[in-house]
């Protein structure tokens, strides 16, 4: 007599949109579902239910989220929505009334419960038999991972609605962060990308209280966290660093090789008038002097930043001020966005002249051309120098990787001719042979 086959595990499809912080949220939800016996599938057709983790930061991101929700409904029919756009449930249901549930960001339990209601977990599921790794389910390649250290933000930048979506700053216990980092490294991660809405504010909400890791006291504070992370023997890269005065403390750690000499600081603009309208504190800051001082302490320092052009009230004089500032600052990696009104943002109520779309486009093009010249000149200086490269991809044409001044997805690449025995996750020393405004070409030593 044949033994009846066990019922199949329930299957979940998942779409993750938006920033690395949202990606970490997706990883947490998927880890919980996997521990409960759900299989994660890669097609709409194979899924019993689809979860869409949305982005709601700007209008174009909302449009993409609504488009993906519609695609999931068309291809599957059973869709649960979560993430930053989830705070606008009415707007989502106006366009897609058939979605089964809508939750906001960080509402992990509500998402999992919504999945339970659509397709319950198997009653006889034994979580001990699931091969969920200690570091959880990761959506990044095996050799790098995002390490989220806090949620929310205490700032009130006039163009931003993150505090209304994700709340005020809540720092994770320092011991938990370091335990997670250690698990990731043990699993094969070679690069930790430290993220949050405001990385340098870590611990402010708990008054930098002392926690414990491996039996030793560690302050819940950015500098001490970086010191501890540096003992793990992997690349540590800092993102979303607000330019607080205590950021100066991180530069000696970079100069000493404890963490990567890479700072991702979203300056947003340079004109004091525009920064004041944005409610950014840097309008009181001698930012150029600080950058000069940082580079004196750590000559290899790479600075990445993002800027907004076309903010309400921005004049041609303000824009020229920004271009001149870029010339002096000599930033290495730069992104630029045209200002887009965000529903609920205080900037919508500013009594300032709106910059026409065609002017925004013109300024964006001029900004990008100006910065490309700067970036290209800085990368040309790398030709002939030796760099350590972390390999991301290998194919028949060679290998593609990154060095210390390249974060994944947002920065450039290092192209290596001929892969040899290289594989993703390997580190290899190379000599730079060529460069353009974004990328390097190199040969192995």
UniProtKB/Swiss-Prot annotation:
[4Fe-4S] cluster 1 binds at residues 19, 55, 84. Gene3D superfamilies: Methylthiotransferase, N-terminal domain (3.40.50.12160), Nucleic acid-binding proteins (2.40.50.140), tm_1862 like domain (3.80.30.20). It is an enzyme of class 2 (transferase). SUPFAM superfamilies: Radical SAM enzymes. This is Ribosomal protein uS12 methylthiotransferase RimO. Pfam families: Radical_SAM, TRAM_2, UPF0004. Its EC number is 2.8.4.4. Its cofactor is [4Fe-4S] cluster. SMART domains: Elp3. The keyword Cell wall biogenesis/degradation does not apply. InterPro entries: Elp3/MiaA/NifB-like_rSAM, Methylthiotransferase, Methylthiotransferase_CS, Methylthiotransferase_N, Methylthiotransferase_N_sf, NA-bd_OB-fold, Ribosomal_uS12_MeSTrfase_RimO, rSAM. It is found in: Cytoplasm. It comes from the Bacteria. Belongs to the methylthiotransferase family. RimO subfamily. The keyword rRNA-binding does not apply. Residues 380-445 form the TRAM domain. Binds 2 [4Fe-4S] clusters. One cluster is coordinated with 3 cysteines and an exchangeable S-adenosyl-L-methionine. The gene is rimO.
């Amino acid at each position: 007599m044949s033994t009846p086959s066990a019922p199949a595990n329930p299957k979940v499809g998942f779409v993750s949109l938006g920033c690395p912080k949202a990606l970490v949220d997706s990883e947490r939800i998927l880890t919980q579902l996997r521990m409960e016996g759900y299989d994660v599938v890669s097609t709409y057709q194979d899924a019993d239910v689809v979860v869409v983790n949305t982005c709601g930061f700007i209008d174009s991101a909302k449009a993409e989220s609504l488009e993906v929700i519609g695609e999931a409904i068309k291809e599957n029919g059973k869709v649960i929505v979560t993430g930053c756009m989830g705070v606008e449930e009415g707007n989502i249901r106006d366009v897609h009334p058939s979605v089964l549930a809508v939750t906001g960001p960080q509402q992990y339990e509500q998402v999992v419960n919504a999945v339970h209601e659509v397709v319950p977990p198997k009653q006889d599921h034994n979580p001990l038999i699931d091969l969920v790794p200690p570091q959880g389910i990761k959506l990044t390649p095996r050799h790098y991972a995002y390490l989220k250290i806090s949620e929310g933000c205490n700032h009130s930048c006039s163009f931003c609605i993150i505090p209304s979506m994700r709340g005020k700053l809540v720092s994770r216990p320092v011991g938990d962060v370091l335990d997670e980092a250690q698990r990731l490294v043990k699993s094969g991660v070679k690069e930790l990308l430290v993220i949050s809405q405001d990385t340098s504010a870590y611990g402010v909400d708990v008054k930098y209280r002392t926690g414990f890791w491996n039996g030793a006291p560690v302050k819940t504070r950015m500098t001490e966290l970086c010191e501890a992370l540096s003992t793990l023997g992997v690349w540590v890269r800092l993102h979303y660093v607000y330019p607080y005065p205590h950021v100066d403390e991180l530069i000696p750690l970079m100069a000493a090789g404890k963490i990567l000499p890479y700072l991702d600081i979203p300056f947003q603009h340079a004109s004091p008038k525009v920064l004041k309208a944005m409610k950014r504190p840097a309008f009181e800051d001698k930012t150029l002097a600080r950058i000069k001082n940082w580079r004196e302490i750590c000559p290899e320092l790479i600075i990445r930043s993002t800027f907004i052009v076309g903010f309400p009230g921005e004049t041609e004089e303000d824009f020229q001020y920004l271009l001149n500032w870029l010339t002096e600052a000599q930033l290495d990696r730069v992104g630029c966005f045209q200002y887009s009104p965000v529903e609920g943002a205080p900037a919508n109520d500013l009594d300032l002249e709106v910059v026409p779309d065609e002017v925004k486009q013109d300024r964006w093009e001029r900004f990008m051309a100006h910065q490309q010249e700067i970036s290209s000149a800085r990368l040309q200086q790398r030709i002939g120098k030796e760099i350590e490269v972390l390999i991301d991809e290998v194919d028949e044409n060679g290998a593609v990787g990154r060095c210390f001044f390249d974060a994944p997805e947002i920065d450039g690449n290092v192209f290596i001719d001929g892969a040899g025995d290289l594989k993703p996750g390997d580190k290899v020393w190379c000599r730079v042979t060529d460069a353009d405004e974004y990328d390097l070409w190199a040969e192995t030593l």
